[in-house]
């Protein structure tokens, strides 16, 4: 179990839940970061007394410095401040709860210091999984996943090295489960952000609706557990009780179950290999008299998932391009600037137009990321 942490993205959905878990466990929070939500960041800082708060938005950072002038809390600004928060001294673990590819640099910085990474930023592995996992091995840094599915797989595989046959990656199917492609044409942002089982931020809620989130998790699982696309099967599981499963060499299937509450995998990433009492509700099997259900995904109705699985097989910079294009497209959709189907159409166009580079270094990955973002903006003439 760790005793001191830095929380990157403390004002987001996962970050806020991490703060609550840290308070429950009595952890020392050394650093917090936010993009621009300084009202909540100030409240968290006064409650947790970190040594450092990073604000990526420069204007917001200046305002927070003034607000915290009566304290001894240092305030940094810009993306470099994220890295500063990630490598702060006397920190056992870094929770990477920032959204998007911006999480890559601070994650690598923390890895270089040998920190435990409680990884909630899946884009880090989607964009640079080979590099991140290699550096973690070289630096002796633990990567413990926070995503509920990967935490489940991690828990199922603990102590079973060399026994894995297949990963069974579950997903609820999102708010439009069972809808045809045509039926989703007029979906609005307000409809897409309403997830039936989980409480999440707007961007990841849209990704869950399109099932791009499951595609990103598919790629993340490949890197975390050293498997190929053929070793992962995606299953739609509407109840979100079985968070994922593993099939072992002898045909045994082991599953991790629990209520859909992100505080559980967050806490496990911080207490591993120990377990501590949590404040989460307990699973009541009698609440599911109709049983638990599992279905194969309809890839025609879920083209974003199919595209992600295709990019996983292509490898190189293809997942980076897909992820960057999707980030831009989803934010345009949330701003009511493009339609729901335009998310997939623009991301697929970017993947088709930008040739993948095999075995990329970080500079090539960054260039592919920027090219994909520019492509989508140009695609919609923004």
Language-model-detected regions and their locations in the chain:
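Catalytic, metal-anchored helix/loop core of enzyme active sites in primary metabolism
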Residues: 1-382
């Amino acid at each position: 179990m760790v005793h001191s942490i830095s929380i990157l993205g403390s004002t987001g959905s996962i970050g806020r839940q991490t703060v609550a878990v840290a308070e429950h466990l009595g952890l020392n929070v050394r650093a917090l970061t936010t993009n621009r939500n300084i009202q909540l960041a100030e409240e968290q800082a006064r409650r947790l007394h970190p040594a450092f708060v990073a604000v990526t938005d420069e204007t917001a950072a200046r305002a927070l410095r003034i607000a915290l002038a009566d304290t001894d809390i240092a305030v940094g600004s810009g993306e470099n401040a994220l890295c500063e928060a990630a490598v702060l001294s006397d920190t056992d673990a870094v929770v990477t709860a920032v959204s998007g590819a911006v999480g890559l640099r601070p994650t690598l910085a923390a890895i270089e210091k040998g920190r435990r990474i409680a990884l909630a930023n899946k884009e880090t592995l989607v964009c640079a999984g080979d590099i991140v996992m290699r550096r973690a091995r070289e630096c002796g840094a633990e990567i413990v996943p926070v995503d509920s599915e990967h935490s489940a797989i991690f828990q199922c595989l603990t102590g079973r090295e060399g026994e894995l046959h297949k990963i069974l990656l579950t997903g609820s199917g999102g708010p439009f489960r069972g809808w045809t492609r045509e039926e989703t044409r007029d979906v609005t942002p307000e409809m897409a952000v309403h997830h039936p089982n989980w409480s999440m931020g707007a961007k990841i809620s849209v990704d869950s609706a399109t099932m791009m989130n499951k595609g990103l998790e598919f790629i993340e699982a490949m890197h975390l557990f050293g498997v190929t696309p053929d070793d992962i099967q995606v299953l739609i599981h509407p109840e979100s009780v079985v968070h994922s499963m593993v099939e072992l060499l002898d045909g045994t299937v082991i599953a991790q179950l629990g209520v859909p509450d992100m505080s559980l995998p967050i806490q496990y990433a911080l207490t591993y290999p120990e377990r501590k009492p949590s404040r989460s509700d307990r699973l009541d099997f009698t609440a599911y008299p109709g049983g638990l259900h599992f279905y194969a995904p309809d890839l025609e109705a879920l083209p974003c998932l199919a595209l992600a699985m295709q990019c996983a097989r292509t490898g190189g910079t293809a997942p980076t391009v897909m992820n960057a294009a999707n980030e831009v497209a989803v934010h345009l959709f949330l701003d009511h600037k493009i339609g729901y189907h335009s998310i997939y159409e623009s991301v697929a166009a970017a993947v088709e137009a930008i040739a993948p580079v095999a075995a990329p270094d970080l500079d090539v990955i960054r260039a592919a990321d920027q090219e994909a973002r520019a492509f989508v903006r140009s695609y919609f003439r923004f």
